[in-house]
């Protein structure tokens, strides 16, 4: 079926390139001819190979349109190997405060299916925990969880994040489920710290953030827009981000359901400058956020150099946006993704058996 679709659309170059890169770089599941890629379950190096492929893909598109901008910050990769032990703790703390939880016996962090390689990377790198599947009411696979259940491994994790919590939510859960007596660790109270000096925000943004790049149109005009967005139920974390980055704004949004959300946005070249500098130093480790950030970084550099409205720049940006916008997956692709997730789950479960 996929092969037939590709044959029908061979004259649409942009679509073909988009489909090819989507299959190869977003999921690493299939060859260009629709044949499942054989091989062992992903190891730590797989996420690095994936990021290098994504980066090279973006640079190739830049070169294709002969866009002359400084590629130094687009052309480098930074992983946990490049972090100090202290920085690793800040990244884990931000991720844990964003999408983590503490239960009766378990520490857990949830990841989207697209970030299954990140979950596996962290599990393998730190050699703690295992990966499990998360299903919806229709028994469809929707996410994966990195679960840490062994006492010694929980102590390793808590030693990394101890003294690096910004909020009381995980701190309160730690005492609620009696981990203060079960683990040989005195958990320090959360405290405010300078977010610009460590990768806490990278971890938190990997969990809860969003980089947007797009065109806004009005009548016969269009202009390039990009921003960083974070949404929370209260404004505490957002206020701290605004305080230390000295930019952006916070909006309060009330919904008909009675819920309230606070939304932080930095949405101009001037507002994004400190974030560009920060994320160039502490790059996103989430596959989704990394792709979003590469696109935003390119858009930012184009606008900074007043190249963003040139014909070649517009065509290039639209191709990159199309590359990111492909969301619909065939049943075959979904099955391949599910199989990859199951391989990782089985592998980490086997490695976790004492």
Swiss-Prot record:
It is found in: Mitochondrion. The keyword Transcription regulation does not apply. One of its GO terms (molecular function) is endonuclease activity. Its main location: mitochondrion. Its EC number is 3.1.-.-. Keywords: Endonuclease, Hydrolase, Intron homing, Mitochondrion, Nuclease. It comes from the Eukaryota. GO terms for cellular component: mitochondrion. It holds the Pfam family LAGLIDADG_1. It is an enzyme of class 3 (hydrolase). Coiled coil: none annotated. One of its GO terms (biological process) is intron homing. Belongs to the LAGLIDADG endonuclease family. Endonuclease aI5 beta (group I intron) is encoded within an intron of the mitochondrial COX1 gene. Splicing from COX1 requires PET54, MRS1, SUV3 and MSS18. Translational initiation codon is predicted to be ATA rather than ATG. Mitochondrial DNA endonuclease involved in intron homing. This is Intron-encoded DNA endonuclease aI5 beta. It comes from Saccharomyces cerevisiae (strain ATCC 204508 / S288c). The gene is AI5_BETA.
């Amino acid at each position: 079926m996929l092969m037939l679709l590709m044959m029908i659309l061979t004259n649409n170059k942009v679509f073909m390139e988009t489909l090819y890169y989507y299959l190869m770089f977003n999921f690493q599941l299939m060859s260009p001819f629709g044949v499942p890629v054989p091989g062992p379950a992903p190891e730590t190096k797989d996420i690095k190979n994936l990021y290098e492929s994504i980066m090279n893909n973006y640079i190739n598109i830049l070169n294709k349109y002969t866009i002359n901008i400084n590629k130094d910050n687009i052309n480098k990769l930074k992983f946990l190997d490049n972090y100090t032990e202290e920085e690793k703790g800040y990244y884990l703390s931000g991720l844990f405060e964003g999408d983590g939880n503490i239960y009766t016996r378990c520490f857990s962090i949830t990841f989207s299916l697209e970030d299954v390689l990140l979950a596996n990377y962290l599990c393998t790198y730190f050699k703690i925990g295992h990966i499990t599947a998360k299903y919806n009411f229709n028994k469809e696979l929707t996410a994966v969880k990195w679960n840490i259940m062994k006492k010694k491994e929980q102590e390793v994790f808590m030693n990394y994040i101890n003294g690096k919590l910004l909020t009381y939510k995980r701190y309160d859960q730690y005492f609620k489920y009696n981990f203060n007596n079960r683990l040989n660790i005195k958990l320090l109270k959360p405290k405010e710290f300078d977010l610009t000096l460590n990768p806490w925000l990278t971890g938190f943004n990997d969990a809860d953030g969003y980089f947007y790049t797009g065109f806004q149109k009005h009548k016969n005009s269009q202009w390039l827009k990009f921003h960083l967005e974070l949404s929370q139920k209260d404004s505490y974390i957002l206020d701290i981000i605004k305080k230390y980055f000295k930019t952006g704004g916070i909006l309060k949004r009330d919904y008909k359901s009675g819920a309230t959300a606070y939304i932080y946005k930095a949405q101009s070249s001037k507002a994004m400058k400190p974030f560009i500098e920060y994320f160039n130093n502490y790059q996103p480790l989430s596959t989704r956020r990394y792709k979003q950030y590469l696109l935003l970084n390119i858009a930012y550099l184009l606008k900074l150099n007043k190249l963003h409205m040139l014909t070649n720049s517009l065509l290039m940006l639209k191709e990159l946006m199309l590359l990111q916008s492909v969301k619909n997956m065939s049943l075959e692709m979904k099955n391949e993704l599910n199989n990859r997730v199951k391989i990782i789950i089985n592998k980490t479960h086997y490695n976790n058996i004492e």
